[in-house]
From Swiss-Prot:
The protein's Enzyme Commission number: 4.1.1.39
Reactions listed under catalytic activity: 2 (2R)-3-phosphoglycerate + 2 H(+) = D-ribulose 1,5-bisphosphate + CO2 + H2O; D-ribulose 1,5-bisphosphate + O2 = 2-phosphoglycolate + (2R)-3-phosphoglycerate + 2 H(+)
Something else known: The basic functional RuBisCO is composed of a large chain homodimer in a 'head-to-tail' conformation. In form I RuBisCO this homodimer is arranged in a barrel-like tetramer with the small subunits forming a tetrameric 'cap' on each end of the 'barrel'.
Annotated keywords: Calvin cycle, Carbon dioxide fixation, Lyase, Magnesium, Metal-binding, Monooxygenase, Oxidoreductase
Listed name of the protein: Ribulose bisphosphate carboxylase large chain
SUPFAM superfamilies: RuBisCo, C-terminal domain, RuBisCO, large subunit, small (N-terminal) domain
Positions with a binding annotation for substrate: N117, T167, K171, R289, H321, S373
Gene: cbbL
GO annotation terms (biological process): reductive pentose-phosphate cycle
UniProt entry tagged with the keyword Lyase: yes
Active site annotation, chain numbering: K169 (proton acceptor), H288 (proton acceptor)
Complex and partners: Heterohexadecamer of 8 large chains and 8 small chains.
Originating organism: Hydrogenophilus thermoluteolus (Pseudomonas hydrogenothermophila)
N6-carboxylysine carried by residues: K195
Length: 474
């Protein structure tokens, strides 16, 4: 006698289950927008549904265990499709995920689904996560920045202007003593911070403990001479979590105010763990985004940096590198302005002109300082102040240490240029348009600035941006 049929076995099209164009997203849903280039001959609705399925509940065939759960509740839903301006191959797919799919406070769990195996799925030729809407209920379960912008300003007693920093160069090869000397010269010249570069860990030429001690000596000497709070981002990145904590504890023990982590190479869970430690121990946390361009630069495959910025705000950093627009590194101006808003503001409205697809409510979560770093010098100062505003960190590496008169002179030139631009802005002047006049006037009483302007007057990085906003192709 044949057994009664309990379910329909076999393979069926994803769109039968995961394409719901009538679905109205809930406030509690995670929303994602993917840029999809489907395989030839695969309909858009099928590709969108396949991404929704593979990033939520589905496997490649119907399984009887679907009957043991509420598949209708737990599945991801592709609910809308849009054309990508200027790209006939690609389209946007909007997908909603129910709150029950994810562990509270675990960014790792959320993105293991959203950008996990689905990115190797054969049904699509390329796939890019362009934006996500993090529901407020999930935001409130995440730690966020250890301290945030306002607490950091109070700790440093610095207000009304961007903070000024410098990455020590050469990034590799200096002894700890010479490295500390470079830190001291920069700080006494007028900078607020100096910084380890991302790949300065504990190499044979300079072990981490020696570097920390010489840098802290430089900080204390510069503070005593200038009367200002100073700091150096001591990179605690290491091969194990135990080693990271060991370095962080030592930095705290010697009295440094801020440490640094390379959050993509050490991982999100490690960064969130260190962020919690920083909050508990009163340490500021500077976050470097080394490796981000591997993930976000290809305009058709990967993860847009605005998503990485949201992730970092959730897991918790006080500073995050954001690009410069005007320097040597990739950065579309409109997109960068959108990233800055997402790092700092409590509520960000959807704005396609800045690449922001969804409203984002951060509740009471503190904001992060966006960090402009990479190929910038005094001539860029008017644009940087205009783009980034006061709540930012402007870091000039070669643009400080490359000064013909040395580090202290380079730091002095940048500090004078910064204060001249802030003063002009506060007086209502259009500082980007009048930048040359503002800097030239300031240089009359600052020979260090005059020499810096002469040194870098011809230096430009005129390369086209690879990852442009799609709206610019219209």
């Amino acid at each position: 006698m044949s057994q009664p049929k309990r379910y329909e076995a076999g393979v069926k099209e994803y769109r039968e289950t995961y394409w719901e164009p009538t679905y109205v997203p809930k406030d509690s849903d995670f929303l994602a927008v993917f840029k999809i280039v489907p395989q030839p001959g695969v309909p858009r609705e099928e590709s969108a549904a396949a991404v929704a399925a593979e990033s939520s509940t589905a496997t490649w065939t119907t399984v009887w265990t679907d009957l043991l759960t509420d598949l209708y509740y737990y599945k991801g839903r592709a609910y809308a499709i849009e054309d990508v301006p200027g790209d006939d191959e690609a389209f946007y797919a909007f997908i909603a995920y129910p709150m029950g799919l994810f562990e509270e406070g675990s960014v790792v769990n959320v993105f293991t689904s959203l950008v996990g195996n689905v990115f190797g799925f054969k049904a699509v030729r390329s796939l890019r996560l362009e934006d996500v809407r993090i529901p407020l209920w999930f935001v409130t379960t995440c730690p966020g920045p250890p301290h945030g912008i306002y607490v950091e300003r109070d700790k440093l007693n610095k207000y009304g202007r961007p903070l000024l920093g410098c990455t020590i160069k050469p990034k590799l090869g200096l002894s700890a003593k010479n490295y500390g000397r470079a830190v001291y010269e920069c700080l006494r010249g007028g900078l607020d911070f100096t910084k380890d570069d991302e790949n300065v860990n504990s190499q044979p030429f300079m072990r981490w403990r020696d570097r920390f001690l010489f840098c802290q000596e430089a900080i204390e000497k510069a503070q005593a001479e200038t009367g200002e709070r100073k700091g150096h981002y001591m990179n605690v990145t290491g091969p194990t979590m135990e080693e990271i904590y060991k370095r962080a504890e030592f930095a705290k023990e010697i009295g440094t105010p801020i440490i640094m982590i390379d959050y993509l190479t050490v991982g999100w869970a490690a960064t969130q763990s260190l962020s919690k430690w920083c909050r508990d121990n009163g340490m500021l946390l500077h976050v470097h985004r080394a490796m981000h361009a591997v993930i976000d630069r290809n305009p058709k495959h990967g993860i847009n940096f605005r998503v990485l910025a949201k992730i970092m705000r959730l897991i918790g950093g006080d500073h995050l590198h954001s690009g410069t627009v005007v320097g040597k590194l990739e950065g579309d101006r409109a997109a960068t302005l959108g990233w800055i808003d997402l790092m700092r503001d409590r509520y960000v409205k959807a704005d396609r002109s800045r690449g922001i697809f969804f409203d984002q409510d951060w509740g009471q979560m503190p904001g992060m300082f966006p960090v402009a770093s990479g190929g910038i010098h005094v001539w860029h100062m008017p644009a940087l102040v205009s783009i980034f505003g006061d709540d930012s960190v402007l870091q000039f590496g070669g643009g400080t240490i490359g000064h013909p008169w040395g580090n202290a002179a380079g730091a002095c030139a940048n500090r004078v240029a910064l204060e001249a631009c802030v003063k002009a802005r506060n007086e209502g002047l259009p500082i980007e348009k009048m930048g040359r006049e503002i800097l030239t006037e300031a240089a009359k009483s600052c020979p260090e600035l005059k020499v810096a302007m002469e040194t870098w007057k011809e230096v430009k990085f005129d390369f086209d941006t690879v990852d442009k906003l799609d709206v610019q192709h219209r």
